[in-house]
Amino acid sequence: MTSAQNESQALGDLAAGQLANATKTVPQLSTITPRWLLHLLNWVPVEAGVYRVNRVVNPERVAVKAEAGAGTEAPLPETFVDYETSPREYTLRTISTLLDIHTRVSDLYSSPHDQITQQLRLTIETIKERQECELVNSPEFGLLAQVTPEQTIRTFAGAPTPDDLDALITKVWKMPSFFLTHPQGIAAFGREATYRGVPPVVVSLFGAQFITWRGIPLIPSDKVPVQDGETKFILVRTGEERQGVVGLFQPGLVGEQAPGLSVRFTGINQAAIATYLVTLYTSLAVLTDDALAVLDNVAVDQFHEYK
């Protein structure tokens, strides 16, 4: 019987492919997000891992006087500005892991992509995702944990309407920076605004498109929780000069790869496995209560029938 190879008129794809090199991508990690919150926060370096927020006590008692007119000789008020005696101190928190890489793997399989570089890249991306999650949800320093009851409001009818966002703006009216919510929350607001005939304006930031309300961008983050068909809208004012919300990091780390992030080689064990310590130091401070407000109980599962 004649073999299949003898019947072929030319070299086949399977055999030819043994001499070809495929173009290979770096590993793709589906959990990576843009992490817009990390980009939009102002980051402040701290000393010794501690950031103390000094606030004024009883600001309404600071007395000044405006003269009623020329020729008045009423005595001027006397005043002083008092400070808190036990101000809040924010301590940097650690997000870390030990990355293990077999030396045989890094020696033999690092072309065209270096194995150590890719393992570190994916580990660092995962740590930064956890960082954004902590900045939103940490019970100690997260945005949701630091909002005061006076700065928390509920929706009028469940779904996020323009009226709801207007009410939220009244809580952070001193130069608000951005809304932060889950992508489902942005979609829900877009539906409500469009249904009412006021579709949101779109702006371009960092090469991406965002819808806005009253000129304030709505920033998506999957770290904002969605539970039982409800999420939250967070309105933030950022920056130290504006008495807003700031991110905190430790500068000058050994093995620093990015602000607050270090990678250190810790050694090779008897199994020829190399270990790297990847550490991120981070926290978040709210300088004044009116720098942050939350719209609660935002329904994301309401839809409209357009006719």
From Swiss-Prot:
It comes from the Bacteria. The N-terminus is blocked. Transmembrane segments: none annotated. Its main location: other. Keywords: Cell membrane, Cytoplasm, Encapsulin nanocompartment, Membrane. GO terms for cellular component: cytosol; encapsulin nanocompartment; plasma membrane. It is found in: Encapsulin nanocompartment; Cytoplasm, Cytosol; Cell membrane. InterPro entries: Encap_f2a, SrpI-like. It is a peripheral membrane protein. Signal peptide: none annotated. Belongs to the encapsulin family. Family 2A subfamily. Shell component of a type 2A encapsulin nanocompartment. Forms encapsulin nanocompartments about 24 nm in diameter from 60 monomers. Probably encapsulates at least cysteine desulfurase (CyD, AC O32975) and allows passage of cysteine into its interior, probably involved in sulfur metabolism. Expression in M.smegmatis generates a multimeric protein, whereas expression in E.coli does not. Homooligomeric. The encapsulin nanocompartment is formed by 60 subunits; monomers form pentamers which assemble to form shells. There are 12 charged pores where the pentamers meet as well as 3-fold axis channels and dimer channels. Dominant antigen for this bacteria, could possibly be used in vaccine formulation and/or for diagnosis. Protein expressed in M.smegmatis stimulates a gamma interferon-secreting T-cell proliferative response. Has 4 domains; an N-terminal arm not found in the type 1 subfamily, a discontinuous peripheral domain (P), an elongated loop (E) and the discontinuous axial domain (A). This is Type 2A encapsulin shell protein. The gene is enc.
